[in-house]
From Swiss-Prot:
Name of this chain's protein: Metallophosphoesterase 1
GO biological process, one term: GPI anchor biosynthetic process
Pfam families linked: Metallophos (PF00149)
Subcellular location: Endoplasmic reticulum-Golgi intermediate compartment membrane
Stored SUPFAM superfamilies: Metallo-dependent phosphatases
Major location category of this protein: endoplasmic reticulum
Cofactor comment text: Binds 2 manganese ions per subunit.
GO molecular function (one): GPI-mannose ethanolamine phosphate phosphodiesterase activity
Gene3D superfamilies for this protein: 3.60.21.10
UniProt GO cellular component terms: endoplasmic reticulum exit site; endoplasmic reticulum-Golgi intermediate compartment membrane; Golgi apparatus
Biological function: Metallophosphoesterase that catalyzes the removal of a side-chain ethanolamine-phosphate (EtNP) from the second mannose of the GPI-anchor protein intermediate. Participates in the glycan remodeling steps of GPI-anchor maturation to allow an efficient transport of GPI-anchor proteins from the endoplasmic reticulum to the Golgi.
Top EC group: hydrolase
Gene coding for it: Mppe1
Sequence intervals crossing the membrane: 27-47, 354-374
Organism: Rattus norvegicus
Length: 394
């Protein structure tokens, strides 16, 4: 009798031990997959990104300083109306990890977000705006050595007939109202492209007047109005054609000439763009090119990549969305800029499909592990499983 009891206790001990081993295996697999998909994958993918090299002619016997800038667009932080909590959690964690990893690995000096920071800024209440802003500041936190500049987008203040002084002031109170500034000898102009409707509305007229004043300052710095009294007391900007940053792209008929893995899907590229909705109007685009004479234009809004050469030789780069919510393969632009030259490269983030496939593969592996433990696999699979285990133990 004592021998039988001893045998039962030993059997129970082995069963308990096997269950503990199974639980340990399951825990290790789950934690490993979570760490890889939610943390380490960002380092593995972004580690391949490098700053482009810009030509460095000596200027006065010394090298020109190079500004390292990141350009991203259309983060679309969800609000209280259209934002499901799981959607918020998933997509905001993706953007936070991508941004923080990029800051740590790439060490940019300035980051530009080209509009549509928020998805519901066009109708959010004061409390909803404060909540969305708090989440944004947590996700895109940065050290004092990095500057963050944000361009106004239509989802931040509304389309032309939705925007108001209140929404614009609310946005500028947080992100600043500066339109023209210089960093390391590079001039930047940030445009409220939503206000480029051209219908003479108060906000539109003020925006155009501000751009004409910026044009005058740039002309004074480039000594194109020599001897003019209006330039006598004007502080000179660096002698450099500006980089134009805005949310809406300049006018183009469609994305038909755009290419690349992050361009719009082939079936959408030939769909004509609507002026003042998908892109700026022809007239507004011509005004910006004439007033500012930019050497480079960067825009967002379309959520897809495109490169366009405008009349006069001004190149425009449309930056894809930074969020999985808008595309499977988000990316951002890395720019090395001097006062006379620039070089751009693209840095891709992890694809959402890759992460989901990894989770599905891990779930299938866990299922096989559990079925093998309880010997519920078909005989052929069970034989193969035992064969693999015996081979690994050698």
């Amino acid at each position: 009798m004592a021998l039988v009891r001893w045998g039962l206790r030993r059997q129970n001990f082995h069963l308990l031990r096997r269950r503990r081993v199974l639980l340990l295996k399951l825990t290790v697999v789950v934690i490993s997959v979570l760490l890889f998909c939610e943390y380490f994958i960002y380092y593995l993918v972004l580690f391949r990104c490098h700053w482009p090299e810009v030509k460095m002619p000596a200027r006065g016997g010394r090298q020109e300083p190079v500004l390292k800038a990141m350009f991203l667009a259309d983060t679309h932080l969800l609000g209280e109306i259209r934002g499901h909590w799981l959607d918020k959690l998933r997509r905001e964690w993706q953007m936070e990890r991508a941004f923080q990893t990029a800051l740590w690995l790439l060490q940019p000096e300035v980051v530009f977000i080209l509009g549509d920071v928020f998805d519901e800024g066009k109708w959010s209440s004061a409390q909803a705006w404060a909540d969305d802003l708090h989440r944004f500041q947590r996700m895109f936190r940065h050290g004092s050595h990095v500057q963050l500049k944000v361009v106004i987008g239509n989802h931040d203040i509304g389309f032309h007939y939705q925007m108001s002084k209140y929404r614009i002031n609310r946005f500028e109170k947080v992100f600043g109202s500066e339109r023209l500034f210089s960093l390391k000898g590079v001039n930047f102009v940030m445009v409220n492209s939503v206000a480029m409707e051209g219908d003479g509305c108060t906000i539109c007229s003020e925006a155009e007047a501000e751009l004409r004043e910026i044009s005058r300052k740039l002309n004074c710095s480039q000594e194109q109005v020599q001897g003019s009294s209006q330039c006598d007391h004007e502080p000179r900007l660096p002698l450099s054609a500006p980089v134009l940053l805005q949310h809406y792209p300049l006018y183009r008929a469609s994305d038909a000439n755009c290419s690349g893995e992050d361009a719009a899907p082939p079936e959408e590229r030939s769909v004509p763009f609507e002026e003042k909705y998908d892109v700026l109007s022809r007239e507004a685009s011509q005004k910006l090119l004439w007033w500012l004479r930019p050497r480079l234009i960067l825009s967002g809004h379309t959520h897809s990549a495109c490169e366009v050469l405008h009349p006069g030789g001004a190149p425009e780069v449309s930056v894809p969305s930074f969020s999985w919510r808008n595309r499977n393969n988000p990316s951002f632009i890395m720019g090395s800029l001097t006062s006379r030259d620039y070089a751009l490269s693209k840095c891709y983030l992890p694809c959402e499909d890759t992460v989901l496939t990894t989770y599905c593969a891990a779930a299938a592996f866990l299922l096989v592990l559990i079925l093998a433990h309880f010997e519920r696999l078909p005989s052929s699979f069970l034989f193969g499983w035992k064969l693999c285990r015996s081979h690994l133990r050698r």
